[in-house]
């Protein structure tokens, strides 16, 4: 390995090294520097990825820091940093201590970065499972709540099935193509007219495994239980960066043009069922985290709708929505985490009047819900607009109409929460009035992205266009 190779993989090395360093520091000075080191490492990895020059973006050790990989490494690193900021005071309230929490968050970000930079299927699988193993720990890390352990067990069992599907699918694709290099696998197994049954079985298993990772119907049943039982900052991370990594997985594998037709039908049904089931089930929920869980299922259906086009325009809409969705869900779950006390605020009705007692957190939550509903001038409106625009341009008109109607239905359950936030001031719980400094930083950053992209999306659109060239 040359110095140039080390330079290229330094963002990965920073994240992996920081995870180990936090654990070592915990043995010397327990409970003091984990969050600070973790946030610094995430910001450092993001900055390093940003400064890598195109001439240096060669492949080494099965990874290649292309503009695509750099973009997602920055996104995942900053999302991990925001998660650590949201977690700091929440974990104190929940009595979640120890360096394993920040170390595992950083290790999850490392796995996500590996996924986005993968140049062959083996590294892609290892990165995906590295982040999944990290979430097995994070989901069950609240030892004081039986719900957390239950959620962790469900996620572990179903995650093992997903991993088996993906591993078997990769094995079949290797048998069909004779190589693990992603471009060659795509060319040999999804070229126009390719009908190798082994390759088709491999792609089918891959789609089943990824459907679990991003909570597409019918592989969605784990989502509401895990979201309800896991610590809320972990849910913020799981619902954003984890799904972003799985979407990056798909974008690396899915071809554009005629080869995409092979996968069109299964993806079409996954999108349709996810949009309908996610939104209709969310209407029936009284628990806020379960409602947001079903909402996330529908949101993934919108993303797959744009993927269906098989065009660069559709892929650009997907990347835009990944960024927007990350900011929206970080703000929503981050605000819920900040509002949640040791007793907990579980149901939508528990938030009645909270807008008056804790205006900052309630305002962030309301903004996030407006964005998730796709109301202008938030980033959610811009994201949905480009998804449906790409779908219409790509010929997916019936499914796009279903998506628009489903999005209109979703406005009811999002706005129901907002109404509760600002009605009946006397019902507001008496407790601390403001967010902590770390929570305020993370929530303000997410809100800024929601508003900035909603009002002036052009810089982000140009950046996305450049990484897809």
UniProtKB/Swiss-Prot annotation:
The chain crosses the membrane at residues 6-26, 37-57, 61-81, 96-116, 121-141, 156-176, 197-217, 234-254, 263-283, 291-311, 315-335, 362-382, 397-419, 441-461. It is an enzyme of class 7 (translocase). Its main location: membrane. It comes from the Bacteria. NDH-1 shuttles electrons from NADH, via FMN and iron-sulfur (Fe-S) centers, to quinones in the respiratory chain. The immediate electron acceptor for the enzyme in this species is believed to be ubiquinone. Couples the redox reaction to proton translocation (for every two electrons transferred, four hydrogen ions are translocated across the cytoplasmic membrane), and thus conserves the redox energy in a proton gradient. Belongs to the complex I subunit 2 family. This is NADH-quinone oxidoreductase subunit N. The gene is nuoN.
């Amino acid at each position: 390995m040359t110095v140039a190779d080390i330079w290229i993989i330094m963002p990965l090395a920073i994240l992996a090294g920081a995870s180990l360093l936090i654990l070592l520091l915990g043995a010397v000075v327990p409970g003091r520097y984990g969050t600070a080191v973790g946030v610094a490492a995430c910001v450092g990895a993001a900055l390093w990825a940003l400064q890598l020059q195109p001439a240096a973006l060669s492949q080494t050790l099965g990874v290649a820091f292309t503009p695509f990989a750099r973009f997602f490494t920055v996104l995942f690193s900053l999302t991990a940093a925001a998660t650590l900021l949201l977690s700091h005071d929440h974990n104190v309230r929940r009595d979640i201590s120890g360096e394993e929490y920040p170390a595992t968050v950083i290790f999850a970000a490392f796995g996500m970065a590996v996924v986005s930079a993968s140049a062959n299927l083996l590294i892609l699988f290892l990165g995906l499972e590295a982040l999944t193993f990290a979430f097995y720990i994070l989901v069950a890390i609240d030892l004081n709540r039986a719900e957390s352990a239950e959620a962790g067990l469900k996620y572990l069992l179903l995650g093992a099935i997903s991993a088996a599907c993906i591993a078997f699918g990769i094995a079949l694709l290797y048998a069909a193509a004779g190589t693990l290099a992603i471009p060659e696998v795509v060319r040999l197994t999804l070229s126009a007219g390719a009908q190798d049954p082994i390759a088709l079985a491999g792609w089918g298993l891959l789609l089943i495994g990824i459907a679990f990772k991003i909570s597409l119907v019918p592989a969605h049943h784990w989502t509401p239980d895990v979201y309800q039982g896991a610590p809320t900052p972990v849910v913020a991370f799981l619902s954003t960066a984890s799904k972003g990594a799985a979407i990056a997985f798909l974008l690396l594998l899915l071809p554009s043009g005629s080869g995409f037709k092979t996968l069109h039908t299964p993806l079409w049904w996954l999108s349709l069922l996810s949009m309908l089931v996610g939104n209709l089930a969310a209407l029936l929920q009284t628990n806020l985290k379960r409602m947001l869980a079903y909402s996330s299922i529908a949101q993934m259906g919108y993303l797959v709708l744009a993927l269906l086009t098989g065009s660069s325009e559709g892929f650009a809409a997907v990347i835009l929505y990944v960024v927007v969705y990350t900011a929206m869900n970080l703000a929503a779950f981050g605000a819920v985490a900040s509002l949640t006390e040791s007793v907990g605020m579980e149901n939508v009705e528990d938030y009645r009047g909270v807008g008056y007692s804790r205006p900052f957190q309630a305002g962030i939550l309301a903004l996030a819900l407006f964005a998730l509903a796709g109301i202008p001038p938030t980033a959610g409106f811009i994201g949905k607009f480009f998804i449906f625009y790409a779908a219409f341009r790509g010929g997916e008109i019936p499914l796009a109409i279903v998506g628009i109607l489903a999005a209109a239905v979703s406005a009811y359950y999002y706005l129901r929460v907002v109404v509760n936030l600002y009605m009946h001031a006397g019902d507001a719980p008496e407790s601390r009035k403001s967010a902590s400094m770390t929570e305020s930083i993370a929530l303000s950053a997410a809100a800024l992205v929601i508003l900035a992209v909603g009002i002036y999306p052009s810089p982000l659109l140009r950046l996305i266009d450049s990484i897809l060239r």
